Amino acid sequence: MALDKFIKKFINGDASAFDEIYNRTRKSVYYVALSILRDKALAEDVMQITYMRVLKNIQSYTLGTNASAWIIKIAKNEAINMKKVRMREQSVDEYENLALFGVNEPDTYGELTDLAKRLLDDDEFSILMLVTACGYKRKEIGKMFDMPIPTVTWKYQNALLKLRNALEKEGY
């Protein structure tokens, strides 16, 4: 496990090893948070919280297990917690929440990502982004989400089909 080497270095006092842990997991953490929260700023907040929790709890990580899955699980739990809190606080005023009423700010990640965020459920979006943007294998994603590989594959294929159908409807 590549991350284990850096975790061990960090535990032994090499603070620069955390940079490598961050660089190797940041895209995954971001896209998992984004898939749950559907908000870039909140996803970035979850990233900060996630890495603070990783720093705080790195001593409890068991070397030899899947470090990526451990970090992704923390991010997923933090995003779910934030979503629950936001749902309780969410205003239904049209002017305060334009995104709820169909008006979105332009997304720097592209129209296709916007379309995927709108069409896909949380798992489908997470899996799609982890495969396409982060380069994870379905087996790795299955471990991250405690999901059988055939289920990951099905959700990935389903996400692609939904996107293809939507693009065909729009004339692409």
Set out the residue ranges of the language-model regions.
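Arg/Lys-rich amphipathic alpha helix in sigma70-family domain 2
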Residues: 56-63, 72-92
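Structural recognition of an alpha-helix C-terminal capping motif at a helix-to-coil junction
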Residues: 31, 45-52, 56, 65-77
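DNA-recognition helix of helix-turn-helix
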Residues: 80, 133, 138-139, 143-172
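Amphipathic alpha-helical segment used for protein-protein interaction
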Residues: 12, 87, 99-130, 134-143
